[in-house]
Amino acid sequence: MSKRIAGPEIERLIQLLARVPGLGPRSARRAALHLIKKKEALLVPLGGAMQEAAEKVRICSCCGNVDTSDPCTICTDERRDPTTLIVVEDVSDLWALERAGTMNVRYHVLGGRLSPLDGIGPDDLNIKGLVERVSTGEIKEVILAVNATVEGQTTAHYITDQLSSFDVRVTRLAHGVPVGGELDYLDEGTLAAALRARTTL
């Protein structure tokens, strides 16, 4: 049995930090110590921000994004193209696409991807909400921005089937050579996808 080296409040802080993705027990201890050392500058404001987020952040009932308003800021932005919808697996994917800043459109967050091995089926994802949005007739193109994994591709095929009866163009992100990537370092699947998604110059 390991010895307790700190009070229960500090141990609880470490245990909770260790639950954050990307932080293991050791990283959580380091983060906790850093927060405690910078109590007034970091720990107190962080605690307040987390409390405020817990009280005010909600899931958008339209697209599944997280925001302090429902519908979210993206869904209510009239400058965005309402006829194009990008479908993503998770909010982090939505944020990544927004950082890229290449398209001023609306989104739909699935909340995961189909994975029969993990017991995740269509009813566990926000696919029904997507079909309802497309059924209004306002959306002309659905861009499937799912990950290039077996589960991601399975999800893309399922969604394509679900939307086949609607007058909507379904596309997906091209997969292939990343900017700055060298061919010698790419796997065969990535190279094959890049060749299939080649474009005319």
From Swiss-Prot:
CDD domains this protein is in? TOPRIM_recR
Q: Which UniProt keywords apply?
A: DNA damage, DNA recombination, DNA repair, Metal-binding, Zinc, Zinc-finger
Q: Name one Pfam family in it.
A: Toprim_4
Q: Where are the zinc fingers (C4-type)?
A: 60-75
Q: Note the superkingdom of the native organism.
A: Bacteria
Sorted alphabetically, the Gene Ontology BP terms of this entry are: DNA recombination; DNA repair
Question: Known SUPFAM superfamilies for this protein?
Answer: Recombination protein RecR
Output the SMART domains linked to this UniProt entry: TOPRIM
Q: Where is the Toprim domain?
A: 83-178
Q: Would the keyword Secreted be found if you checked this record's keyword annotation?
A: no
Q: What InterPro entries does the database record attribute to this sequence?
A: DNA_Rcmb_RecR, Rcmb_RecR, Rcmb_RecR_Znf, TOPRIM_dom, TOPRIM_RecR
Q: Which GO terms describe its molecular function?
A: DNA binding; zinc ion binding
Task: Write out the similarity annotation.
Answer: Belongs to the RecR family.
The record's section on PANTHER family has: RECOMBINATION PROTEIN RECR (PTHR30446:SF0)
What's this protein's function?
A: May play a role in DNA repair. It seems to be involved in an RecBC-independent recombinational process of DNA repair. It may act with RecF and RecO.
- Please give the name of this protein: Recombination protein RecR
Native organism is Brucella anthropi (strain ATCC 49188 / DSM 6882 / CCUG 24695 / JCM 21032 / LMG 3331 / NBRC 15819 / NCTC 12168 / Alc 37) (Ochrobactrum anthropi)
Show the taxonomic lineage: Bacteria, Pseudomonadati, Pseudomonadota, Alphaproteobacteria, Hyphomicrobiales
